[in-house]
Design a protein with these regions (language model features):
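N-terminal Rossmann NAD(P)H-binding glycine-rich loop of SDR-like oxidoreductase domains
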Residues: 1-26
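SDR active-site strand-loop-helix element
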Residues: 6, 37, 76-80, 120-126, ...
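Rossmann-fold cofactor-recognition segment
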Residues: 48-62
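NAD(P)H-binding glycine-rich loop region in Rossmannoid oxidoreductase-like domains
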Residues: 59-97
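Conserved cofactor-binding/catalytic machinery of classical short-chain dehydrogenase/reductase
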Residues: 61, 75, 101-104, 141, ...
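Conserved Rossmann-fold NAD(P)-dependent oxidoreductase catalytic core, especially the SDR/UDP-sugar
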Residues: 103-147
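Active-site helix of classical SDR
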Residues: 148, 152
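Conserved beta-loop-beta element that borders a ligand/cofactor-binding pocket
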Residues: 157-182
């Protein structure tokens, strides 16, 4: 199985790559190749039982996502994001990475066609809910983002759902509560 991690140089991406390298399997299938991508070249995990390729580019630039999915990865972890504070401070950059990059990735997968239907794991955020919200958030709770970042992630979730509904890929979204930008 070929795995692609977009955002592999970030904290979550590094931890994920290390865990996959340690396990060597995902969902009962052996990992044979990993492509690790970020805006800066990520490190390949040590002692991986599979081949790792590391790439650096801005995935929101035209044509970059097509290059990333050309190898037809079976599972794509889309972890790349401009976090909330920076997305608020630099409106254009937030939308370019968090929304345009996501849209280009999904469109590049769709453009391959020919029965290609990877599993997409999209990381979202509780920022899609705004505030205040209850301690336990049920499926019926509406998304009402109060920030540009929350809006970008909410739109990403809707796109993920629609592309999955149309059968272009098998998508799953994970809403992360809070991510520390730097470990420690």
């Amino acid at each position: 199985m070929h795995i692609l991690i977009i955002g592999a140089a970030g904290m979550v991406g590094r931890k994920l790559a290390e865990r996959l390298a340690k396990d060597g399997h995902l969902g009962g299938r052996e990992i044979t190749k990993a492509t690790l991508h970020d805006v800066v070249e990520p490190s390949a995990p040590a002692d991986a039982k599979f081949t790792s390729t590391t790439l650096a580019s801005d995935f929101s630039m035209p044509g970059e996502t097509a290059k990333l999915v050309a190898g037809r990865p079976d599972v794509i972890f889309h972890l790349a994001a401009i976090v909330s504070g920076e997305a608020e401070q630099d409106f254009d950059k937030g939308y370019r990475i968090n929304l345009d990059g996501t849209m280009q990735l999904f469109a590049a997968i769709r453009a391959i066609g020919d029965g290609y239907k990877p599993r997409i794991v999209f990381t979202s955020s509780i920022a899609v809910f705004g505030a205040p919200f209850p301690e336990a958030i049920g499926d019926e709770f509406f998304t009402t983002p109060l920030t540009s970042y929350g809006t970008q992630k909410a739109i990403g979730e809707l796109l993920l759902s629609d592309y999955s509904r149309k059968g272009f890929f098998d998508g799953i979204g994970i809403r992360l509560p809070t991510i520390c930008v730097r470990p420690g």
